């Protein structure tokens, strides 16, 4: 690894380091893609197991859905963001400009 590719440290604070050019698009390594695929597949299994709890009747070690006992009133109007949809919109907006 060359010194230009490593982040520089100064009194325990990260300073600017060389960044990848932003105009090249997103490039992912095979390891990154494998990790994303693993997380995605595992999450689908968890969702399936939550919807079909009979698979875990004999075993209490299955996934458990967490529900707040006292929901925060400030989050009552919270609407989750679909990150893939947001990325698509941002990509389309950047192509228009």
Swiss-Prot record:
Polar residues biased stretches: 1-26
GO cellular component, as recorded: cytoplasm; cytoplasmic stress granule; nucleus
Keyword check for Nucleus: yes
Positions of the UniProt region annotated as Disordered: 1-27, 54-97
Key words of the record: Cytoplasm, Nucleus
UniProt keyword Nucleus present: yes
Location(s), subcellular: Nucleus; Cytoplasm, Stress granule
UniProt GO BP: regulation of epithelial to mesenchymal transition
Basic and acidic residues bias (residue ranges): 54-68, 84-97
Motif segment (PXDLS motif): 80-84
Main location, first listed in the record: nucleus
Family, similarity comment: Belongs to the MCRIP family.
Biological function: May play a role in the regulation of the epithelial-mesenchymal transition.
Protein name: Mapk-regulated corepressor-interacting protein 1
Organism: Danio rerio (Zebrafish)
